[in-house]
């Protein structure tokens, strides 16, 4: 008398269903992308309420002022040189108002701007001519690309 053992058939069905060891039977879809964790940093304001920070622009470190009143990132001529933008080769054809009057600035795109662990790529910026700006301002062309920023109790929080 012959007894049929269903176990080998069940095992084969499970292997075929899962596609174990059979690459042609696996789903063709790419795996789901990894979930990005939110980056956040908190910056204490100075006694005058301003937020001076160390930033990395195109991987070069500079000092800057976070300025919600500035419509764009504005780099001083000297800082533009430090971060490798070659300001002497730029075209200064954009009129901008500064505390010292109207000057012509050059449009640039920054590959990367980082403040602590908060990073933003492809940031529009302006380079001001030599002597027109004492330091770099990180304005709204940077801040608006963040998921949020807020000032509370003398601390500015940036999230991305």
Question: What is each PLM-predicted segment?
Answer:
Residues 1-63, 68-160:
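Pepsin/retropepsin-fold aspartyl endopeptidases
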